[in-house]
Amino acid sequence: MKKLLLAVLTIAFTFGATLAQGEGASEETRMTLRAELLRMINRDRAKFGLTPVQLDGQASAIADAYCQAQIRNRTTGHFTTDGAAPYMRYSFAGGNDGVSENAAAWSANYGFSDRALYDMMRRSEAAMMSEVAPHDGHRRTILDPAATHAGIGLAWERGEFRLTEEFIRRYVEWSRPLPRGVATSQPILCSGRAARGYDVEGITVHHEALPLPMAAVTANAIETYKLPESKREYLPRLKGRFTQRIAGGIEEVHEEYSDGSRGDFQVAPDGKFAFAIPLPDGPGIYTVVVWVRPHGSSGDAIPASNVSIRLERSAGALISGTR
């Protein structure tokens, strides 16, 4: 029953255009464009029988800040000069859910009229949806059947336009969220509950080195991202031995996973779980992914969190993670 749990990756678009040297973004225009892009996203999802995503205010604010940082640092894609991956950026800003990112960038040379902004946004969404496998990361992100919310970031200034879509998978209600920074490698207690109708399938903890600052040219050369391969997998505790009635008598059942283990953490019938997350691999970024699955389903498990925890090389402050 041990399973390989795969993470989502996405790709970034960069466009050149004979568009815009113009004014900075106004909040009214941004809100109008955001609502229109959400309509486009849900239109595209509806064509494939998928439920609409709801606009998420927190994720939109995170995406806006990232778009502004991209223009400030002259970067495109998923990384800016701090070296943080998208899931780190979302988590360190307070996000507790699963997240996958699409990004588009335009460089321009005339004024940003409302019509020009709308056209860049429309063409970005259309280009993403026109992708063909296997190079269809944006399209698959938009059409993720597990996405429940979306954050939409927009920024334009000095002839640059940036658009970021953060697709959120919200299936865990955290009663004890994980911190975002710790000073020691002691296990960290967390607890929560899976959304009604979903079961907790497992927890993976991915480890990677602390991000390092990078030049804009280096950040712009990175076209994709994914969680690191280095990970540890933890599974719900099984019942152990129990009896069940069968034709002609009673049999004893002994539950175990394929490696002979009985699991690592308790999950209650109502979906509540608690686990002390180990941090055994030294300093770095530990990203905690809680996997859930619709009750009774044999389909793919859903990565319902991307919570990144920073363990410094030396003692540091503890930062609470909230939503």
Language model features: what each stretch is:
Residues 294-323:
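Short beta-strand elements
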Residues 85-169, 202, 206-208, 250-251, ...:
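A well-ordered secondary-structure block
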Residues 157, 166-195, 210-222, 322-323:
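Short, compositionally biased P/S/T/A/G/V-rich stretches that sit at domain boundaries
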Residues 197-253:
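Extended low-complexity, serine/threonine- and proline-enriched intrinsically disordered segments
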Residues 7-14:
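Bacterial N-terminal signal peptides
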Residues 1-4:
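Positively charged n-region of N-terminal signal peptides that target proteins for export
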Residues 23-95, 136-151, 159-160:
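Short, well-ordered surface patches within globular domains
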Residues 21-32, 46-56, 73-76, 101-116, ...:
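Second-shell loop/turn segments in exported
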